[in-house]
Amino acid sequence: DTSPTLTVDSALAKQSFVRPTHEFGQGNVEQQMADATHKASGTLSIGGQEHMYLEGQVSLAIPDEDDRMKIYTSSQHPSEVQKLVAEVLDVKLHRVMVDMRRMGGGFGGKETQAAQWACIAALLASRNHCAVKCRLPRQVDMHVTGKRHPFENRFEVGFDDTGRILATHMDINGNCGHSPDLSDAIVDRAMFHADNGYYLGASHIVGHRLKTNMVSHTAYRGFGGPQGMIMAEALIDKVARHLEVDPLTIRKRNLYGESTGTVTPYGMEVEHNLLPEIMTKLETDGHYWARRKAITAFNRNSPVIKKGLALTPVKFGISFTAKHLNQAGALVHIYTDGSIQVNHGGTEMGQGLHTKIGQIAANEFGLSVDMIEVTATRTDKVPNTSPTAASSGTDLNGKAVQNACITLTTRLAECFAASLGMADQANMVRFEHGNVILGEHSKPFAELVQAAYFERVSLSASGFYKTPKLHYNRDTGEGRPFFYFAYGASLSEVSIDTLTGEYTVDRVDILHDVGDSLNPAIDKGQIEGAFIQGMGWLTTEDLRWNEAGKLISENMATYKIPAIGDTPKHFDVQLFGRKNAEDSIYHSKAVGEPPFMLAISVWCALKDAISSLSGYKLAPQLDTPATPERVLNAVLAAQGQ
């Protein structure tokens, strides 16, 4: 058979995989499923997503003496670019320097797939002994780069009369394209998040990595988590409609906790669980039940426009699932005028990483942020870096920078205390408001730095951090792949036109856990942006390929990302102010990816509006993206029911 393999089903039929299947679970699923009073099953086709970064793929290669090469690239992973360029040029890594000042957006699309353009530029620069820039036009960029993995998933669930889940089986099937890229880790994360915030009872989760004749799909914000998490919400909706109970009641009834269970299907204890508190607070502050009553009455009296309401949780694991990537380095210099330069391994792509890193350094030295310069990410300053991905940028690099700063403040404190004849009190020295203080003695920071220089104290230090507590055994399917979980909840209200399938998102209320926020303005911006991007994935962003596997939604005219008019009329984001119980940087939490999945509440609200046509007895089949066409088809199916 030489016909192209473009779908999960056709790849499964051909047993075409890019990587081996993985599975894990707990309990006796067959027995619990057989004993369950009620059973339900379902399938869901989940679309991919184009990254649509503002700046496309671009690299500049400049040859230097002795076979050295300088690379300026738009990449989330400078060390991988360095490694691959060195392989292409057949030189050692120390001959290649990669400089990354900032990207015009990345979202995962420049984690691995930026490297090939740097390699092409470097090869041509080496052969022709001149600088070469390789930049892709937007349409070419869309054709040749990988997307978010499309998935086609299946579930079966057994539950009791109250809606308590007793047994779950899930098949998580990722369309990986023609090569593995990061698909192993992406399908793993989809499996790790197939429970979302719910205890699934006895469970068995299988993850297939399917090979198809498409571009090699790659990382995208959430990294498989959204494609797994949406299955948990589809499952909950199915249970709720089967029992004719409000979905929020079923959601709260199955949250991890003492009355259900606290261990995930992969054997990790859910500690410091904030979801019950977050959901109850949003339920109250968002007036869920009053609005549910009003919407039910509205739908009863409105023949064409139907409203939907949904409150959904997010529980997202923070750490790279590949353990070795959970490390970071930093290099901090203090100059004799008291100014400070910070180098670290993270990359800035508009998410505010350098701003937070600058704040951390300023706080450690007791200085204003204008005394801190965060440099470009360079492989000759901090080597062997991990990609800026998995929401880990601040967690890893912030801790590494803090480690270097503590080394330097310790040296300066010892120098200051010794100069006062109080060497035994060096641990009492404080760095505050541009001054160094010990008891009644105080000296401006810049003066102490100058004095330390004359005392031959080193004013440069490297820092390092590795995330603790991580382990996972693929053979047994058990471990702790995440340092902690970030939590959140979203309450969305929508209106659909049952004649056309068109809809509006009328109101969104979000309560999200970022620990003790390093920068509330940045964190709120990340939550808002992630939500809108997630909403686009679930509603308007429709990737289409022809029968030969060629992308035909290849430009901004045929591929619709959310516009300003798609922003909810009422859009309220609140931070849940609770310190991270784990020892993260200043007890903050990662914020890059978790809010993306808050947008699942919009998809659930659309289904809720459609379900009203059946008296809330039907869980409509609504594959993603839920375009107006798909919504209309679901409406017609509900009306026919």
Model-derived regions, located:
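Generic long, charged, amphipathic alpha-helical segments
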Residues: 373, 562-587
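Amphipathic, heptad-repeat alpha-helical segments used for oligomerization and assembly
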Residues: 223, 388, 392, 582-594
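Short, highly charged C-terminal tails/helix-capping segments
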Residues: 620-636
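Extracellular/periplasmic helix-exit of transmembrane alpha-helices
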Residues: 540-553
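Structural alpha/beta core scaffold segments of enzyme domains
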Residues: 1-511, 572, 601-614, 634-641
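C-terminal structured "cap/appendage" subdomains that terminate the fold
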Residues: 586-603, 607-614, 619-620
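Conserved phosphate-binding loops in nucleotide/dinucleotide-binding enzymes
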Residues: 517-532, 625
